[in-house]
């Protein structure tokens, strides 16, 4: 059986961190993929580096995807993914752009692509509840995520989870089952989801 990976895509406050923690609790093979990050803001869950280092990796063909958001630069690098899967781990990637989901999916793993969704009001409540200092920026990103989904409505997903209707534990169990079953991807009713 080939190695597996999980992509969690969704707006801020959709539960990516919480669900990743639940996945690791269910099965220690699941491990958060810590993206490279250059710039200000939160450092937990990232490998802090410089923009120059990200550029160096990109020139060497080792960056699968990079993006800028919240005044910082982020990258998903092939060496770290290879190290995790080589150690028998199941990397869990947090994504905020469908283009990134598509780019990373090119890596030959059995990807389980999960769309996490919650309404704007839930994002606002969760971001305020966890003490985010940039709630307005995160609400702007919620709208960008919604538009990103509408712009890529044909993108197939293994699962679409309404995180305002499920506990993190329930969501993690659904994802774990999808990995165990080798769930494929199918086109979903994105327009109906984000209305």
What is each stretch, according to the model?
Residues 11:
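P-loop (Walker A) phosphate-binding loop of NTP-binding proteins
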Residues 14:
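ATP-binding Walker
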Residues 101, 129-180, 186-195:
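Small-molecule kinase domains that catalyze NTP-dependent phosphoryl transfer to phosphate-bearing small molecules
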Residues 36-98:
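ATP-dependent small-molecule kinase phosphotransfer cores
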Residues 17:
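Walker A/P-loop
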Residues 8:
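Hydrophobic anchor at the beta1->P-loop junction of P-loop NTPases
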Residues 92-96, 106-128:
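Conserved phosphate-donor/acceptor-positioning beta-strand/loop module used by diverse small-molecule
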């Amino acid at each position: 059986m080939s190695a597996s990976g999980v992509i969690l895509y969704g707006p801020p406050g959709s539960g990516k961190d919480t669900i990743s923690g639940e996945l690791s609790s269910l099965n220690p093979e699941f491990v958060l993929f810590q993206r490279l990050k250059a710039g200000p803001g939160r450092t937990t869950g990232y490998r802090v580096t410089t923009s120059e280092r990200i550029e160096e990796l990109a020139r060497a063909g080792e960056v699968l995807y990079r993006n800028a958001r919240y005044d910082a630069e982020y990258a998903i690098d092939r060496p770290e993914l290879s190290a995790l899967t080589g150690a028998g781990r199941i990397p869990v990637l947090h994504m905020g752009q469908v283009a990134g989901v598509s780019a990373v999916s090119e890596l030959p793993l059995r990807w389980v692509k999960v769309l996490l969704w919650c309404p704007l009001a839930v994002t606002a409540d969760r971001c305020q509840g966890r003490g985010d200092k940039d709630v307005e920026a995160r609400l702007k990103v919620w709208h960008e995520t919604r538009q990103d989904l509408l712009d890529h409505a044909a993108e197939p997903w293994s699962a679409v989870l309404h995180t305002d209707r499920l506990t993190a534990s329930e969501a993690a169990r659904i994802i774990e089952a999808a990995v165990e079953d080798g769930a494929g991807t199918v086109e979903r009713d994105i327009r109906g989801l984000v209305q």
